[in-house]
């Protein structure tokens, strides 16, 4: 049976494999997602300059949902999309962070798409 340590190491290895292929620019930044047990985090990153352009998470003050469920993840997706559109960013590259595209990760992506991001 897999232990939690094995799972996190496997996720990190998957993420490194994916990161070899996915790259964000200023025109099309990388939408990076991280999921913990209690919260979910999303940020748009310009990999050329190594800067975070926009960030949103369920741990922010003023967040109305619960970060450990799908509804909260969808709200975070909408929040990051609204902040990105304010800065004039519409197209992004989605980086699931080594997590399976299912559940909270999928809901965050759908929330960002509904709010206007294109990926």
From Swiss-Prot:
GO biological process, one term: translation
Entry-linked Pfam families: Ribosomal_L18p (PF00861)
GO molecular function: 5S rRNA binding; structural constituent of ribosome
SUPFAM superfamilies found in the cross-reference section: Translational machinery components
A single cellular component GO annotation: cytosolic large ribosomal subunit
Annotated signal sequence range: none
InterPro entries in alphabetical order: Ribosomal_uL18_bac-type (IPR004389), Ribosomal_uL18_bac/euk (IPR005484)
UniProt keywords, alphabetically: Ribonucleoprotein, Ribosomal protein, RNA-binding, rRNA-binding
Function: This is one of the proteins that bind and probably mediate the attachment of the 5S RNA into the large ribosomal subunit, where it forms part of the central protuberance.
Summary of subunit composition and partner proteins: Part of the 50S ribosomal subunit; part of the 5S rRNA/L5/L18/L25 subcomplex. Contacts the 5S and 23S rRNAs.
Homology family: Belongs to the universal ribosomal protein uL18 family.
Name this protein carries in UniProt: Large ribosomal subunit protein uL18
